[in-house]
Amino acid sequence: MKKKKIGLLVMAYGTPDSLDEVEAYYTHIRHGRKPSEEALQDLIGRYKAIGGISPLAKITKEQAHKLTDSMNNMFTEYEFNCYLGLKHTAPFIEDAVEEMKRDGIEQAISIVLAPHYSTFSIKAYNERAIRLSEEIGGPVIKPIDQWYDEPKFISYWADQIKETFTKIEDKEKAVVIFSAHSLPEKIIAAGDPYVEQLQHTADLIAAAANIQNYTIGWQSAGNTPDPWIGPDVQDLTRDLFEEYRYESFIYCPVGFVAEHLEVLYDNDYECKVVTDELNAAYFRPNMPNAQSTFIDCLATIVSRKMKEIVDKELILNNN
């Protein structure tokens, strides 16, 4: 019997593949407005500081393909086909939807490689995909909206923190900062759950790791006139040091799932500059990347959505 094909649409932010692509990438982020030469060179300088280019593109592809393999192993009566759709670089989200249509995919599941729901992130990604799929007559996309409290995601970070604490002598003088990408403050007034979800993630991980000294912070805010959510992790580090005299700072950028510019530069460079100034120790646990434990986490999340499709098919077949 021929296996039914299911599209697995994996969406992420995207990153330039080379320094030559940085300007086009930055221009796309700015909705078609080219950045100033000063802003462009600043961004290029950041990429150079982490080795020339971000590893994100390679990691994202690996995550998507390993997740697809895992789904095919779990649901042997179906054939999952992987489609990668990116927000700011090719292949764009629309490219992936059009490819699914050409391949004859009738049903698809979408997952964004970001755990916390926001109108700026997960909602925007899924709306782009579903809008085009409806315009071109398919496929039907079943979106996954959030997974910030997925037990396997919580366990991953709890284990990483426990491992990090084995390297710290005075654990009472250590603090964990859970962070995510800052967004414009106006989302809070609009009722966006983004901030609450980060706090919930932090609370769950802290409980699982049995830590008391922790807080949430925000990083990588955009350079726009609008105020962005704070406190920024660098300012927060200084404030925590002044108030509690912590000697070790553990940065857990749980809003991200891979090593990329925001982690390798904003955390590993900028935050470390601050801890060095304070004569404090800097720690940043391993990111999930394409580790098997994280792929298993993603597969569990997608499986839940897949079971909805399977159950619906069973109901239809029995009627």
Curated annotation (Swiss-Prot):
Binding site for Fe-coproporphyrin III: 13, 30, 46-47, 54, 125
Binding site for Fe(2+): 181, 262
Entry GO terms, CC: cytoplasm
InterPro entries: Ferrochelatase (IPR001015), Ferrochelatase_AS (IPR019772), Ferrochelatase_C (IPR033644), Ferrochelatase_N (IPR033659)
GO biological process: heme biosynthetic process
A molecular function GO annotation: metal ion binding
Top class in the EC scheme: lyase
Gene3D superfamilies: 3.40.50.1400
NCBIfam families referenced in this protein's UniProt entry, alphabetically: hemH, PRK12435.1
Family designation: Belongs to the ferrochelatase family.
Protein name per the record: Coproporphyrin III ferrochelatase 2
Organism: Bacillus anthracis
Species lineage: Bacteria, Bacillati, Bacillota, Bacilli, Bacillales
